[in-house]
Amino acid sequence: MEVGIDFGTTFSTICFSPSGVSGCTPVAGSVYVETQIFIPEGSSTYLIGKAAGKAYRDGVEGRLYVNPKRWAGVTRDNVERYVEKLKPTYTVKIDSGGALLIGGLGSGPDTLLRVVDVICLFLRALILECERYTSTTVTAAVVTVPADYNSFKRSFVVEALKGLGIPVRGVVNEPTAAALYSLAKSRVEDLLLAVFDFGGGTFDVSFVKKKGNILCVIFSVGDNFLGGRDIDRAIVEVIKQKIKGKASDAKLGIFVSSMKEDLSNNNAITQHLIPVEGGVEVVDLTSDELDAIVAPFSARAVEVFKTGLDNFYPDPVIAVMTGGSSALVKVRSDVANLPQISKVVFDSTDFRCSVACGAKVYCDTLAGNSGLRLVDTLTNTLTDEVVGLQPVVIFPKGSPIPCSYTHRYTVGGGDVVYGIFEGENNRAFLNEPTFRGVSKRRGDPVETDVAQFNLSTDGTVSVIVNGEEVKNEYLVPGTTNVLDSLVYKSGREDLEAKAIPEYLTTLNILHDKAFTRRNLGNKDKGFSDLRIEENFLKSAVDTDTILNG
């Protein structure tokens, strides 16, 4: 079985069938799994998602590792800039080998882990949950990344998946995946769509067109430092002014995310319970106050969006909203008010899983199991600096993926350094470096190099000079043996140990029975006659509310 994975900043989703929520794997009752892991002190196991967050909130000794995706692409050269922008409440450092390490939130010794290890541990658990749910082995995956990720950032995810031993069929941009899913289930023809993907940590827009069974990405734009987490931090600052007790920013950040969702779904809600030291406080926060907090972030997203819209003026554009922050009323309203937008499409049922479902559609396409074809394109220009800091274009922005380019260079007798930069600046050193490698010289003092530049379906770059591949010195340091020392624990065992006896007690009292664990199954006539699951579904209980306490 091959899967699509939406590896998100705040939530992640794994899809085994592109049929919406029903084709995604639930973990702790939800297909939207918090992108975090918790390692209890002195334990050889770890938790993910809701179970990880609950262990941290309950004060279990150990460390909660959060936001690994936001650190993709960080090196010794730019770590200070990222720390300044992201303002982490945990330790961040670069080790002697150039690998990025992050610490965790919580108590006990703060063990620093490589970001690729955190990503790998999380994805490994997500895949295990999918295999348990479907009783099928995962053999390959397509993973999504923000549209504005360069080749180096994409390699973080690729390296993490290498640690799993699972081949990556491709790495696709998040808004492209959402568009692929949206168009796969619609009959839209020859219209210009803009997929507005406002996620937890990044904001991206891809402009796409569909003709027959062919979907073509024609332009992408984004901001890697804008997302729902930024809005959460702003809400935290407001809440801190309203409460009298003490509460850590990290714990408040977990609770304000649900407050944001509650207000988006029901503007009549005005009061919220906030945990503080020694108890809880009731805090007033209205939908109007939320709109005021969201406004500057929505304005930033709209400004980025408009830079893309300008390329297609005056053509009308349909905006397809995806990503968790697209659920915010203020964001959707600001997009709808743009003159060039003819329609806003927002599916409240599938919008949060559309990226994972689109990744699965793309996986099926690459495997030859779908009639759809995607022409994906390069988000930024790739250049090679030859002389005088002048960039020579290797792959222009908008080049199809995958693609290849061959160039001949007259070189001297010494080693030759090949460097590739990504970006639109007319000075190479002002763009993001994505490749650096040395081609060793042999033979005559002056010769011709035949260099082949390759851009693969996973978005990474390779260079072959005179038939020999040049090693990229910017390669992300890979995963470590920490993967062998930790075993995923779903938390299901502890939950069942506590919940099943309570469930049996309640069941036997309500129905005057004497059921034991052996009776809990549809094969037992006495139990199946109660039609418990059928009646539960008829009651229309909000399961997320129950699971979130």
Swiss-Prot record:
GO molecular function terms listed in the Swiss-Prot or TrEMBL record: ATP binding; ATP-dependent protein folding chaperone
Keywords of the record, alphabetical order, are: ATP-binding, Chaperone, Nucleotide-binding, Virion
Q: Which domain of life is it from?
A: Viruses
Tell where it localizes. Answer: Virion
One term under GO cellular component: virion component
Alphabetical list of InterPro entries matching this protein: ATPase_NBD, HSP70_peptide-bd_sf, Hsp_70_fam
Q: What family is it from?
A: Belongs to the heat shock protein 70 family.
The entry's function note states: Transports viral genome to neighboring plant cells directly through plasmosdesmata, without any budding. The movement protein allows efficient cell to cell propagation, by bypassing the host cell wall barrier. Two movement proteins, p6, Hsp70h and three structural proteins, CP, CPm, and P64 are essential for cell-cell movement. Also plays a role in virion formation. Together with CPm and p64, encapsidates the 5'-terminal portion of the viral genome.
Identification of the protein by name? Movement protein Hsp70h
- From which source organism is this entry? Grapevine leafroll-associated virus 3 (isolate United States/NY1) (GLRaV-3)
